């Protein structure tokens, strides 16, 4: 959980030496859970080929992947590319209302009841799906032009290094040294967790919780 710091009292400002993570020159742990609007802002995604597909008639972009592999981050980054887009997340066992949107972005589409899913798939707007299940055959039977992307399948050391650097810079407090994650640690994280970005962030969160000063972070 990311906690943004505020002044402790209108009478007396907080002693900066007692603020969390001030010893690391950070406002907060960079690898805690971020609000959705910041996840989109910090996404490291090449949206160009995805947007090119969505410009095609009856386009559907399908992002498939297990939990923690970046589906929702992709969806939120794409939402920011469209002023009229609508994003709907389907929690387990619930059916939230689905507004009009162009495109319409459906997160956890595998949880949508089949009859509602059929209705949504027939809407005359581009669709962007985050799903654990492949709906290609069903969509093609409806005449949709489907592009499928495996979320997280291109997470390599270069991309992960960029993600990590952006998160640390986002949490930076002032000019000066901050903790850094060397490529040797990036490689170890990929060896241990593969392309599970959420697991990597959790591991880094624990490492940063125990740092005493800005340094090279090692496993």
For the regions a language model picked out, list residue spans one by one.
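Residue-level preference for the first positions of well-ordered beta-strands
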Residues: 60-62, 86, 103, 126
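Walker A/P-loop nucleotide-binding motif
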Residues: 56-75
């Amino acid at each position: 959980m990311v906690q943004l710091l505020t002044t402790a009292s209108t009478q007396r400002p907080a002693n900066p030496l007692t603020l969390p993570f001030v010893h690391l020159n950070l406002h907060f742990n960079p690898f805690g859970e971020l609000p959705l609007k910041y996840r989109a802002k910090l996404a490291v995604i090449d949206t160009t080929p995805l947007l090119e597909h969505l410009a095609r008639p009856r386009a559907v972009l399908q992002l498939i992947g297990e939990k923690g592999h970046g589906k929702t981050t992709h969806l939120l980054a794409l939402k920011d590319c469209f002023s009229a887009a609508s994003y709907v997340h389907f929690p387990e066992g619930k059916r939230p209302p689905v507004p009009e949107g162009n495109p319409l972005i459906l997160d956890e589409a595998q949880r949508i009841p089949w009859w509602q899913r059929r209705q949504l798939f027939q809407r005359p707007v581009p669709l962007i799906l985050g799903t654990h299940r492949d709906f290609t055959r069903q969509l093609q039977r409806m005449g949709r032009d489907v592009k499928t992307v495996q979320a997280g399948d291109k997470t390599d050391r270069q991309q992960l290094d960029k993600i990590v650097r952006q998160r640390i810079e986002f949490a930076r407090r002032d000019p000066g040294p901050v903790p850094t994650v060397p490529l040797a640690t990036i490689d170890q994280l990929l060896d241990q967790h593969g392309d599970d970005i959420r697991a990597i962030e959790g591991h880094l969160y624990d490492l940063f919780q125990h740092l005493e000063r800005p340094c090279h972070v090692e496993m």
